[in-house]
Amino acid sequence: MLKIGKVESYIHEKLKEEKLHFVLLDPEDVSPRLASKLAKISEEVGVDAIMVGGSTGAEGEVLDGVVKAIKENSSLPVILFPGSHGGLSKYADAVFFMSLLNSRNPFFIAGAQALGAFRVKHYGIEPIPMAYLVVEPGETAGWVSDANLIPRHKPKIAAAYALAGQYMGMRLVYLEAGSGAPEHIPNEMIKVVKSAIDVPLIVGGGIRTYEDAKEVVQSGADIIVTGTAIEKAGSLEESKKRLESIINGVKEVSP
């Protein structure tokens, strides 16, 4: 049986007290220097973990450089969010070992995972099994992964996939609208999915403001993820301001 590791235990323990906010940094969009600064700011304002990865699949020295820069400037867990089997770094703490359940391409359901499995084991990275579902509009993530996008007005389809993922042993479910999406996952879909599953629910894509974050958490998200809104804020000061606002929206709803 796959044991629950240090990072996953950290997530579950924190969820007993509050809802969580993760920042996603894409090595193709941020340099190691910028990543280190964003990581430091993230920890200062109360972010709970930093995810590293992207749909177009940064890997090798580019990925390692960003992960190491984050680790050197923050004590937050670094969780890989790979676009494919190449998105692995031995310097990370954990990896969301995810299956994109609504992809038309079996490579993204189990192929990439098979190609990366022994590297995860060899590197000693903690794997966290996760069901990944891409909802309209999907943005780059949907296009690259050939996702059969879940319609925004069909929450039961999302719930069916989410529950299937749970029954297949996934310990997290992630609803993805796509980085830079004009809107976040519909509140009704979040509610329906959350009511169907017993594992933590992550929601990402299109979350830019205090109001967005509060709505998403009130609807049932346990963890929200923001990336584009932080990476492309224009300045470190604006990134910090946006992070503080979003975190306030998350923590205000926490039990």
UniProtKB/Swiss-Prot annotation:
SUPFAM superfamilies for this protein: FMN-linked oxidoreductases
GO MF annotation list: imidazoleglycerol-phosphate synthase activity; magnesium ion binding; phosphoglycerol geranylgeranyltransferase activity
Binding-site positions, sn-glycerol 1-phosphate: Y174, L175, E176, A177, G178, S179, G180, G205, G206, G227, T228
Disulfide bonds: none
EC number per UniProt: 2.5.1.41
One record GO biological process: glycerophospholipid biosynthetic process
Reactions catalysed, as given in the entry: sn-glycerol 1-phosphate + (2E,6E,10E)-geranylgeranyl diphosphate = sn-3-O-(geranylgeranyl)glycerol 1-phosphate + diphosphate
Cofactor(s) demanded: Mg(2+)
Pfam families: PcrB
Alphabetized InterPro entries for the sequence: GGGP/HepGP_synthase_sf, GGGP_HepGP_synthase, GGGP_synth, IGPS_HisA/HisF
Residue numbers binding Mg(2+): D26, S55
Subcellular location: Cytoplasm
Keywords, sorted A to Z: Cytoplasm, Lipid biosynthesis, Lipid metabolism, Magnesium, Metal-binding, Phospholipid biosynthesis, Phospholipid metabolism, Transferase
The keyword Lipid biosynthesis is assigned to this record: yes
CC per GO annotation: cytoplasm
Alphabetical list of CDD domains matching this protein: PcrB_like (cd02812)
Enzyme class, spelled out: transferase
Pathway the protein acts in: Membrane lipid metabolism; glycerophospholipid metabolism
Function (record text): Prenyltransferase that catalyzes the transfer of the geranylgeranyl moiety of geranylgeranyl diphosphate (GGPP) to the C3 hydroxyl of sn-glycerol-1-phosphate (G1P). This reaction is the first ether-bond-formation step in the biosynthesis of archaeal membrane lipids.
Family statement drawn from the similarity comment of this UniProt entry: Belongs to the GGGP/HepGP synthase family. Group II subfamily.
PANTHER family, per database record: GERANYLGERANYLGLYCERYL PHOSPHATE SYNTHASE, IMIDAZOLE GLYCEROL PHOSPHATE SYNTHASE SUBUNIT HISF/H IGP SYNTHASE SUBUNIT HISF/H
UniProt-recorded name of the protein: Geranylgeranylglyceryl phosphate synthase
